């Protein structure tokens, strides 16, 4: 568990042997979450286990049976619904990261800030408009003070990285054979050139890239980091303090997801989770379109966080959030 004054994570977290241990732990805990994911249609119904518990609780006749789940149909439905949801506001992000549009804004960065970011970027607009959430007051202040030129430059850098990644780094024939996080080539996204602290942090910038190209970019959301905490069974693996996926707010004395967690490491674990999901899909004769690779991963992460939402709320003492988890999800 990390103080807000500490580094994003301990040095051991970048060690390949450590990463292999984390992946092994994820593998051990994956199956029950996947079964629940499919049996409940990603949380839209109850699982067989939950059905039996309700029967016991209310003394219902054991002759009443829950319909068996067609795993193949359920996974297909989950994937299609996830894509449909993903696409709803995707065009807004594609327009935001359009290189020609960004070039035009170089003549008027203030317009970029007030129009493209404030009014047209869904996650930023939603955050700024959510005035009931007092914990977002600081974000609103930081956005108001943010320099338009620097904001534009960060988004231009993200756009350039996002549009050039497939050409520079991605080989679809060898992608699933990658073993080291370094070979995913995401380390630049953890640098200052791709961050505007307080306004465009790990959550927002990875959402932008995820919406641009979910074939290669995973979304490092609040739910995703929490889900890795649970997929590793809350274990402390090699670290001196506590789980690398948690952070302690010293001033408020509350536990949150590690919103400083390096994207280059997160991308590796999201990649490994995709491989597990893809293997299950093959067993069920379900095709997961690689162009939407990380959409199914995000849906899985969201489901795990939903399962544990009561405990997460108790740990973080935060108000329930809407949409993308506006708040400390990585600004």
Name each region found by the language model.
Residues 204-210:
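Short, small-residue alpha-helix embedded
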Residues 1-196, 215-225, 229-331:
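An N-terminal alpha-helical hairpin/helix-loop-helix interaction module that forms a charged
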């Amino acid at each position: 568990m990390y103080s807000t004054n500490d580094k994003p994570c301990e040095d051991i977290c970048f060690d390949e042997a450590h990463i292999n241990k984390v992946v092994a732990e994820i593998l051990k805990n994956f199956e029950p979450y996947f079964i629940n994911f499919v049996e409940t249609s990603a949380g839209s119904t109850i699982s067989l286990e939950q059905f039996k518990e309700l029967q016991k609780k209310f003394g219902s006749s054991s002759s009443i049976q829950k319909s068996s789940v067609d795993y193949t149909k359920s996974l297909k439905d989950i994937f299609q619904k996830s894509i449909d949801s993903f696409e709803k506001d995707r065009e807004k992000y594609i327009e935001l990261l359009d290189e020609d549009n960004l070039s035009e804004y170089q003549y008027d960065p203030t317009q970029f800030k007030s129009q493209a970011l404030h009014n047209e970027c869904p996650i930023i607009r939603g955050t700024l408009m959510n005035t009931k959430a007092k914990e977002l007051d600081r974000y609103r202040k930081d956005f108001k003070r943010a320099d338009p030129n620097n904001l534009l430059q960060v988004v231009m850098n993200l756009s350039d990285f996002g549009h050039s990644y497939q050409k520079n780094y991605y080989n679809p024939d060898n992608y699933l054979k990658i073993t080291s996080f370094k070979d995913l080539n995401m380390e630049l996204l953890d640098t200052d050139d791709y961050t505007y602290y307080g306004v465009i942090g790990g959550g927002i910038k990875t959402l932008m890239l995820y919406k641009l190209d979910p074939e290669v970019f995973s979304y490092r959301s609040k739910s995703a980091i929490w889900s890795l905490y649970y997929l590793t069974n809350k274990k402390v693996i090699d670290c001196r303090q506590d789980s690398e996926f948690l952070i302690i707010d010293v001033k408020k004395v509350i536990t949150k997801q590690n919103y400083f967690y390096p994207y280059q490491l997160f991308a590796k674990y999201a990649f490994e989770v995709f491989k597990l999901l893809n293997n299950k899909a093959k067993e069920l004769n379900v095709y997961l379109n690689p162009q939407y690779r990380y959409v199914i991963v995000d849906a899985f992460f969201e489901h795990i966080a939903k399962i544990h939402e009561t405990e997460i709320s108790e740990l973080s003492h935060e108000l329930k959030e809407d949409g993308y988890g506006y708040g400390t999800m990585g600004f």
